Amino acid sequence: LLLWAWTMAGKSVIQLKRPDLEGYFDFVHNPPTPWIGTSVQDRFKIIGGESRQNELWRPFAGKIAKENRKQAIVEGTDIEVLRDGHTLSHEAMKICYSAVSCYYDYLTDEGYAFGNPIPAIRKQSPYLIKGATQKNIKRLSDLQWDYVLECAQSAADADPLHERTLFVTATLKSLYLRVSELSDRSNWQPTWKHYWRDSDGNHWLKVLGKGNKMRDVSVPSALLPFIERYRLYRASLSPSFGINSALVAKNRGTGGMTSRQLRRIVQDAFDLAYEKMRSEGFDGEASALREATTHWLRHTGASQDIATRPLKHMADDLGHASMGTTDQVYIQSDMKERARSGKTREV
């Protein structure tokens, strides 16, 4: 807001009137290309002990589809052209209105402004549309998942270095994990002691999820061979391997892996599956797989299991605060009931 007010409106934020702010939200919803970057960048960088402006920083970061980014690299196209037509999503606009409203509340409380015009502007906003819409969960199809798992297994059979690829891919999908929950962080380092068995013989994995909330995720029997396979591989590499060793370790160096490193591992499995699907004639499914991200594994596992497990159990394993969240994301029972009853209507 400050940057726009100074450079575009030529005013201080305390001089902005309602028409000015409405123009600002129009601007934010569809910003000009020079204001949009192709990746998230820090505004300042520490160079030689001094804070310097980062020339790559832009106020907005366009979300470039993975397939478009890869295609641009293959064709040698400037990825900058892919920013055209960028608009903020409904959720992003909601956050924008809320942030600016809080800012004007502060200015009012401190005596810089004479009131907060944002609530009135938000009421008339064309960018905030009320109403429920059915969410499309981004997940792998059953065929895509079969290829991903099969290719990861084949790679591990051919080269032990891919044992980690197989373990990470199978674990993220089967336990509905966010990639951060398997990564090494400043406040949490997943180790083999977090994989444990209770007195009834049930297996669990302790993870630190969103909001620094600890939970135990139930481990299905089908995943146990993959865990044991990776454990034996790790034990063969080092005599010091034990319960305090990192759950997912680097091939070189010590310690666990970052989220970025784990995403690269999963991408290896996706790339192998993509090539095999194309070679076997599944061009459409292969093309869709190029859009897949690591988080799709979480959605894939949950979507496959939601019909056969109690909602409460799914919510607990997913780390959702309420069953309502799980229902809204994966079941959407209200939408399905409405669709079922609506099918019998006459023309």
Describe the residue ranges of each PLM region:
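N-terminal core-binding DNA-recognition domain of tyrosine recombinases/integrases
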Residues: 1-135, 155-156
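Short, basic (Lys/Arg/His-rich) helix/loop patches that form interaction surfaces
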Residues: 263-316, 323
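DNA/chromatin major-groove-contacting recognition/catalytic segments
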Residues: 316, 328-347
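Basic, Lys/Arg- and aromatic-enriched nucleic-acid-binding interface segment
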Residues: 87-90, 147-179
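DNA breakage-rejoining catalytic core of tyrosine-based enzymes
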Residues: 128-150, 212-222, 238-243
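Short pre-functional
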Residues: 101-105, 163-184, 205, 304
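C-terminal catalytic core of Y-nucleophile DNA break-rejoin enzymes
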Residues: 209-229, 243-269
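Conserved tyrosine-mediated DNA breakage-rejoining catalytic core shared by Y-recombinases
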Residues: 184-229, 235
